[in-house]
Swiss-Prot record:
Membrane topology: Single-pass membrane protein
Name of the protein in its database record: Squalene synthase ERG9
Known function: Squalene synthase; part of the third module of ergosterol biosynthesis pathway that includes the late steps of the pathway. ERG9 produces squalene from 2 farnesyl pyrophosphate moieties. The third module or late pathway involves the ergosterol synthesis itself through consecutive reactions that mainly occur in the endoplasmic reticulum (ER) membrane. Firstly, the squalene synthase ERG9 catalyzes the condensation of 2 farnesyl pyrophosphate moieties to form squalene, which is the precursor of all steroids.
CDD domains the UniProt entry points to: Trans_IPPS_HH (cd00683)
Cofactor: Mg(2+)
Gene coding for it: ERG9
Pfam families linked: SQS_PSY
């Protein structure tokens, strides 16, 4: 991207500078303490990974080497699977037995034509370092490689899927499980084994699965045009057939509106994993591990917003800008709250771009609202406008008394009545009023007193 772009978009340049200047790695790798073989492993990590190399090398030293080797093993496996020049009768046994082959001293593979073939040609350095890590870590890496290798072999043998593409959403999610869900499972086991994550994460496989599904589905949605050119079709027919009659119509300019609606449908399917991804990240204890899992998820939600209702995704492989990537990385290396803010920001952008004419308009709007509602349960906060209104209403409201104030007020009223009554009686007595007759007449009503007999003064008895 040229200088002119950054002159026209200074905020992009600001984000890049902010990341370069202010980002402080939690842990730094020390090459001086590494063996020549391990240094070679990190060189291949940098060669084969653009997205994960930097963040892996900032991991806690307890997991730095195990996760690097785990990545290289899976990258080697993936290189063999992607190599279309290898005949199936040769590829399938390698995939199914890779978990044992990667423990054979000196093993190398020189028949691949893929871009990452150099890793396989010098895979013996990975094997050497694998034998040095702790036994529990080695066991986890071997087990995950076995599961993934068998899953890849199953798909390689599935001629129907290779010819006609993925048919159902269930098949689509099973594929995502093998290529990404298993990676998440292995990483979670490593996090828990190293005591850098809440052990309860190991008991919630759905959370781990959502982390992998969210990333892989995002990649598949974004790589639509590239996969089509390579003869691959990962969009499930169960989804695209609701919008176009033939797969080729997705790239027909006359069918662009329908194709965009299909991509929107795929984005909706990916967004359903958002809440569980955020919940998973809440279980990470170590900051470097949190950065490792949060950065890809932040990039994924930004990528979904980029491809949503974007016709360019039908013509080329679109990517978020370097400035946006640096801004997201800076925010995702803080804490869960800032990650939630990233998700909220891009979710709102998706909701804003949503088109009422889209068949999934209501479902997409509801899913975006659901994500925001979930974030609100994690970090509830009051609306300043509502808070100001509540305070104003409280000030205008009649003051209320508590029990103590009521007793005091009652006592004051009684005392006032007594004083006023005493003053009136004293005034009457001063002016000659006689109260003794009143008291004498009233005394006859007291117990033990006889009532006075009235004197006869008239002739009423006659």
């Amino acid at each position: 991207m040229g200088y002119l772009y950054y002159l026209l978009h200074p905020y992009q340049l600001r984000s890049i500078i902010q990341w370069k200047v202010w980002h402080d790695p939690v842990h730094e790798r020390d090459p001086s303490t590494e063996s020549p073989e391990l240094q070679e492993c990190f060189r291949y990590l940098n060669l084969t990974s653009r997205s994960f190399a930097a963040v892996i090398q900032e991991l806690n030293h307890e997991l730095l080497v195990p996760i690097t080797l785990f990545y290289l093993c899976l990258r080697g496996l993936d290189t063999i699977e992607d190599d279309m020049t290898l005949p199936l009768e040769k590829k399938i046994p390698i995939l199914r037995n890779f978990h044992t082959t990667m423990n054979e001293d000196g093993w190398q593979f020189h028949e691949s034509q893929e871009k990452d073939k150099e890793l396989l040609e010098h895979f013996d350095v990975v094997i050497t370092e694998l034998k040095k890590i702790k036994a529990p870590y080695h066991e986890i890496i071997t087990d995950m490689t076995r599961k993934m290798g068998n899953g890849m072999a199953d798909y390689a043998e599935n001629e129907e899927m290779i010819k006609n593409g993925v048919q159902t959403i269930e098949e689509y999610e099973l594929y995502c499980h093998y290529v990404a869900g298993l990676v998440g499972e292995g990483l979670t086991r490593l996090f828990v084994e190293s005591e850098l994550a809440n052990p309860k994460l190991a008991e919630r496989p759905s959370l781990t699965e959502s982390m992998g599904q969210f990333l892989q589905k995002t990649n598949i949605i974004r790589d639509l045009h590239e996969d089509w050119q390579d003869g691959r079709r990962w969009y499930p027919k169960e989804i695209w057939s609701q919008h176009v009659d033939k797969w080729e119509d997705m790239f027909n300019p006359a069918q662009q509106t329908k194709a965009i609606e299909c991509v929107s449908h795929m984005v909706l399917d990916a967004l359903k994993h958002s809440e569980e991804c955020l919940f998973y990240m809440a279980g990470i204890k170590d900051q470097s591990v949190f950065n490792f899992v949060a950065i890809p998820e932040g990039m994924a939600i930004a990528t979904l917003e980029l491809v949503f209702r974007n016709p360019e995704v039908l013509k080329r492989n679109v990517k978020i800008t370097k400035g946006d990537a640096c801004k997201i990385m800076f925010e995702c290396t803080q804490n869960l709250f800032t990650v939630c803010e990233v998700f909220k920001r891009y979710t709102r952008k998706i909701a804003k771009k949503n088109d009422p004419r889209d068949p999934n308009f209501l479902a997409i709007s509801a899913q975006c609202a659901k994500i925001e509602q979930f974030i609100e349960t994690l970090f509830p906060k009051q609306d300043p406008k509502k808070l100001t209104l509540t305070q104003a209403q409280a000030q205008n409201k009649e003051p209320t008394m508590d029990a103590g104030e009521a007793v005091v007020l009652f006592g004051v009223v009684i005392a006032a009545l007594v004083c006023i009554s005493g003053l009136m009686l004293g005034t009457a007595w001063f002016f000659g009023a006689r109260f003794d007759h009143i008291f004498r007449e009233a005394s006859v009503f007291l117990p033990g007193r006889e009532k006075a007999t009235p004197m006869i003064t008239g002739h009423e008895e006659l």
